[in-house]
Amino acid sequence: MRQTLPCIYFWGGLLPFGMLCASSTTKCTVSHEVADCSHLKLTQVPDDLPTNITVLNLTHNQLRRLPAANFTRYSQLTSLDVGFNTISKLEPELCQKLPMLKVLNLQHNELSQLSDKTFAFCTNLTELHLMSNSIQKIKNNPFVKQKNLITLDLSHNGLSSTKLGTQVQLENLQELLLSNNKIQALKSEELDIFANSSLKKLELSSNQIKEFSPGCFHAIGRLFGLFLNNVQLGPSLTEKLCLELANTSIRNLSLSNSQLSTTSNTTFLGLKWTNLTMLDLSYNNLNVVGNDSFAWLPQLEYFFLEYNNIQHLFSHSLHGLFNVRYLNLKRSFTKQSISLASLPKIDDFSFQWLKCLEHLNMEDNDIPGIKSNMFTGLINLKYLSLSNSFTSLRTLTNETFVSLAHSPLHILNLTKNKISKIESDAFSWLGHLEVLDLGLNEIGQELTGQEWRGLENIFEIYLSYNKYLQLTRNSFALVPSLQRLMLRRVALKNVDSSPSPFQPLRNLTILDLSNNNIANINDDMLEGLEKLEILDLQHNNLARLWKHANPGGPIYFLKGLSHLHILNLESNGFDEIPVEVFKDLFELKIIDLGLNNLNTLPASVFNNQVSLKSLNLQKNLITSVEKKVFGPAFRNLTELDMRFNPFDCTCESIAWFVNWINETHTNIPELSSHYLCNTPPHYHGFPVRLFDTSSCKDSAPFELFFMINTSILLIFIFIVLLIHFEGWRISFYWNVSVHRVLGFKEIDRQTEQFEYAAYIIHAYKDKDWVWEHFSSMEKEDQSLKFCLEERDFEAGVFELEAIVNSIKRSRKIIFVITHHLLKDPLCKRFKVHHAVQQAIEQNLDSIILVFLEEIPDYKLNHALCLRRGMFKSHCILNWPVQKERIGAFRHKLQVALGSKNSVH
């Protein structure tokens, strides 16, 4: 029933007038058949939503009931979420009104009892969420009709047992969530209702389970996943659990934080008769892993042992884990005191049994060092993380990784280990290594290049955040395959040596030299790095290099980087930019010049940045944003950052910029608050985007008079030159036109037989293309014959006469339009004009335009007095860029050649 609030209004104190103010549902948002009515303090179900909605969200409201009648209009619902309300009872008729309902979420309500009728009509449900209610006991069989149910969530209730019914049911159930209840024992008679079920996940975490009765798991048809996290099992109950799991279908077993402090060769004995593939023993404070503890788990593939306290890993502790591919030992070996004697130990050959191991995580441990046979036997290891793992790994020698000599290691993480020195041949055993991370250490040395010997397949070396690195010409000579080199904040020295330390890195795509206070760079430092795509040089001191006052002039250290996509030059103190500094950077997409001292930029500095998408110039000293400087850069921009610049709000400085930002779709963060005028004084602090540009229109009489006089003078000069150089041609065309109009010559093209299918008008420079493609079309279609000047003009005939005759003998005229054609004097002055004139005089639609290049209409009109709108669409063709579309182009051309010449 709709709840209403009576609102009584009095007028004059005499005439009462009552009104009913209904609760509003207009705040619900509806999109793509999904209605969101959450967080609206609703006390009843809205009745004005579209009838075709399939998803309805009513969470976080004040609903106490769900009257079935209120859902009559929403019969298409497949998902209903009424969580976080105060519903205490569910009407059985609800699902009768919602026959298509598949997902019902009732979490965080006040349901306490479920009768046999509660879900009797919810036969299509696949998910039922009842977590965080007050259900303490399941009586009879409330879920017996849910034959399609896949997920049932009863977690965070007060259930004291797993009994959910008295007869076999829920045959399609895959996930049963019973965590955070008061279950103390698992009994077969309570679980036998799942005799026909295949449970992929049985979630019993955070219960007080003390007993596993015999056959409790065998009562379930098939059990694949069991989760008992945060259950105080201990070693004894864990052993009993595993015995009960024997001969089941268990695949995944999670025992995180189950107080399993020790393991022995009998702990997991029961799992010998299973095919367990995943075992989670994390957060157990496990300190003793006995020999052969996991010998019964030959099928295990994923093993989680992180956050334990293993004091000694024996040579046979991991025996039997022959198929493990992933092993997580993060923070599993931690010392108990500051005493060196308390450091955890890992025996040699401890990992030799893990023949299939590919991923090993040993981060955040207190291991004394790497022994000569620590990793021996890991013949399939590809990823090894040793970040913050060692207490005394100060120097990497040629013996450090000898135990990995037979491992096909691809990724090695050695960060946060306080490494101070890398000796020659330190990685010579790691020939397959692709990624080497040495960041966040204390390395301080000269890199001779011998450190990387043997890294024949290296792809990335990360050396950022170390003490200092001094480069030499051979620092990277032995790693030509390197594509990513990170040298951020390493107090880089000798970077300006010649030849450049980076010269051998021809395959480099990412180079990070930021935060190094670099002041000197040679113009050949990046020479040869033609594949470089990302260059980070922020937070250095490169200002002098681009000054015109620099001895020898500006240093163009970016030359040749034709494939560079991202350039970061933030915080370098630049106050000048040479006009050609970005000349070669045609593919540049992101430029960051923020936090510098730039004021005036050269007019054409961004002319070649046609691909630019993001430009950052924040916190500079820019006062003027003019079109001649920023126009090319802003053309395809998607993001612009020019915050905190002292803009000069005058017509000359920002009028164009204001018009642009008010019209563009480019993302400009904080436009209203951080783009403020600095000068003149009366505009100080005024938002730039609100600057009135209407006053910038020039209406000075003198300038207007000057423009008019200049225009008249230029027109007069043009006419004089035209008559002087082209007078005879004008006279000739005038006479021809007069003769045509007066009827000196009659032409009836309807009965005339043409010798050529088309006459080709093209620029001289395009003759090779014309010959290649039109002659090949003639060979493919014998009925086609084009008039090609080089082949078909009669010898000895005057060229102009031959052109006129050939056009008359051709049924169509094809213009091959390129920039060369627009500049070809013969084509512009005679061929094109004569062809168009003949088509107009004969009332024919005989011209076909073939565009080999993208030519704007205004250029076409300016050069040839033609526009695309003068021709039918099928007579305008564009040469395709893709070779596979050439056949389609030729087909369209043949259609155009076969079309009627008549305009009507």
From Swiss-Prot:
The Phosphotyrosine modification is found at Y759, Y858
Please name every pair of cysteines joined by a disulfide bond in this record: C28-C37, C95-C122, C649-C677, C651-C696
Keywords of the record, alphabetical order, are: Disease variant, Disulfide bond, Endoplasmic reticulum, Endosome, Glycoprotein, Immunity, Inflammatory response, Innate immunity, Isopeptide bond, Leucine-rich repeat, Membrane, Phosphoprotein, Receptor, Repeat, RNA-binding, Signal, Transmembrane, Transmembrane helix, Ubl conjugation
| Tissue specificity statement from the Swiss-Prot or TrEMBL entry | Expressed at high level in placenta and pancreas. Also detected in CD11c+ immature dendritic cells. Only expressed in dendritic cells and not in other leukocytes, including monocyte precursors. TLR3 is the TLR that is expressed most strongly in the brain, especially in astrocytes, glia, and neurons.
Q: Which residues form the signal peptide?
A: 1-23
Disease named in the record: Immunodeficiency 83, susceptibility to viral infections: An immunologic disorder characterized by increased susceptibility to severe viral infections, including herpes simplex virus (HSV), varicella zoster virus (VZV), influenza A virus (IAV), hantavirus, and possibly respiratory syncytial virus (RSV). IMD83 clinical manifestations include acute infection-induced encephalitis and pneumonitis.
UniProt-recorded name of the protein = Toll-like receptor 3
Organism equals Homo sapiens (Human)
Point out the gene that encodes the protein: TLR3
